[in-house]
Amino acid sequence: MAKDMDTIVSLAKHRGFVFPGSDIYGGLSNTWDYGPLGVELKNNVKKAWWQKFITQSPFNIGIDAAILMNPKVWEASGHLNNFNDPMIDNKDSKIRYRADKLIEDYMQDVKGDENFIADGLSFEQMKKIIDDEGIVCPVSKTANWTEIRQFNLMFKTFQGVTEDSTNEIFLRPETAQGIFVNYKNVQRSMRKKLPFGIGQIGKSFRNEITPGNFIFRTREFEQMELEFFCKPGEEIEWQNYWKTFASDWLTSLNMSSENMRLRDHDEDELSHYSNATTDIEYKFPFGWGELWGIASRTDFDLRKHAEHSGEDFRYHDPETNEKYIPYCIEPSLGADRVTLAFLCDAYDEEGVEGSKDARTVLHFHPALAPYKAAILPLSKKLSGEAIKIFEQLSSKFSIDFDESQSIGKRYRRQDEIGTPYCVTFDFDSLEDNQVTVRDRDSMEQVRMPISELEAFLTEKTKF
């Protein structure tokens, strides 16, 4: 079925996945709050990433670096001078756009070219396309544009009691630099030999010119990043390894491979620090969008921090007796983006035999579902006994307890929030200590001893 973004956003708000930020005060543009189900879903996504990329990896370990860092970090990394987007303003609407995204949206929506990439084009090349194609502002419908200029994406603030340049600091625009500046601390304290990786999950902030598409592009967002260090010359081999590993992680959590593609960056599109980058893209209802960037950052970051800090980041190879600055592969994934992708991928509307109404269902992998099961007493008279099952299971799983309305309406409600199993406690349960377990996807029902529920859910939530 063709999926509509407005319908998915409406469901997310209605069912408590995501709410507009500061809603009672009219909101704040491009801010979103995760509701009770959204925070469970996103936490499960982060848990699944950490499990496979850190806990179960023989190579990788984790850290949690500070959001606020010495400004010299951003000077060394190049963010102060190079972390910019091409900005263009429409003189009539007074609205500001990212020039590259304005062109890409036009090429996709008007020309039908989903593969056109403007990133990497010069200002002159982008302005020529805008002028030659007669691209207009979506609001004013005019082509009365300013010249394209650079716009730095970093949020600036001040530390201390006075707001002057000596106290100027920045909210981090990426989590990666917190890993690079801790490279020696981690490598020495954990006695790691190459190859090895350092991963973390954390908030980052970018003053995006044109954020949008719900939680896909926001100014405050969460990243799940791994910096994997290896011997120079082995970086492409490891980049291919992490491309496959990342793709397999997505499909192991039931993301449809038909909605995924790998796209290699052209040479003129590569970031200044990269000699190879591949994006894993997902086909959202609004078009293809980047989920995961897997970049070979060479030795750029460690070398720059060595130059600016005076620290020696060379690795002494015990096998060859060489000294060299390691190369780095960075698989960088947006937690909000991939949560949105799992939400879009799971959404479905299905016809039900014997009913004229379609059911809305979220086909989440059980490991990601906000609730692993819902306990449903057939009658409120049975709630006292049914709640005991909730208490038994909720120490290990996220479980819902729902006793209101008919059992059919409760099934539909649980389908709509992606609960994989409904456990119905009926009057027979009082006698035989068994319950009816309904599968969300097949709608099939089986009778099961209460004593087997924990083992059943443990097995089903593996991935």
UniProtKB/Swiss-Prot annotation:
The keyword Glycoprotein does not apply. One of its GO terms (biological process) is glycyl-tRNA aminoacylation. Its EC number is 6.1.1.14. The keyword Nucleotide-binding applies. Its main location: cytoplasm. InterPro entries: aa-tRNA-synt_IIb, aa-tRNA-synth_II, aa-tRNA-synth_II/BPL/LPL, Anticodon-bd, Anticodon-bd_dom_sf, Gly-tRNA_synthase/POLG2, Gly_tRNA_ligase_bac, GlyRS-like_core. SUPFAM superfamilies: Class II aaRS ABD-related, Class II aaRS and biotin synthetases. It comes from the Bacteria. ATP binds at residues 206-208, 216-221, 290-291, 334-337. Belongs to the class-II aminoacyl-tRNA synthetase family. Homodimer. Catalyzes the attachment of glycine to tRNA(Gly). This is Glycine--tRNA ligase. The lineage of its organism: Bacteria, Bacillati, Bacillota, Bacilli, Bacillales. The gene is glyQS.
